[in-house]
Amino acid sequence: MPRPTRGDNLLGPSAKPKVRGSGWAYQPGTLQLGQDHFIPLDSPAWFAWLDQQLAFRFEQVYYVVGRGLAEPVYLNYTVRPEPRQRGQGYWYAYKKYHNQRLSGAYLGPTDHLTLAQLDQRGLQFLAQINPTFYQQLSQFGLVHFRQGPPPEPAPEP
């Protein structure tokens, strides 16, 4: 089945599906179905779902653990396929920064678009946004959680 075109988006230009770092893809209710859909990432249903998407929004919450606090770091960016004249297309990630500068990055073909790949790209975007982020990461450690809130931080010695 061919990928839909931008003109086929019945939900409007701002109704991108959301993919959450919790391991689920969230498809807003459609005009035909009137309900929401959740798809586990890295499953066969995930890769079939990707073949039908024009773009989606990846959202993740990371926690920098240190100084007795688990501080949340929120991230979101747009992912969309870019067609090629020969062969299958490739996916790219795009993040707009506060200064309105757009940064893009290659993610690879559909069969390589996994949660681990999305997480890795997200960490690279975070490093571009806040250069001290990796300093905090190396000093205190980073944890991101698939489900639920972060655990209580360990007491400092």
Which residue ranges define each predicted feature?
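A positively charged, amphipathic N-terminal helix/segment that binds anionic biomolecules
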Residues: 2-157
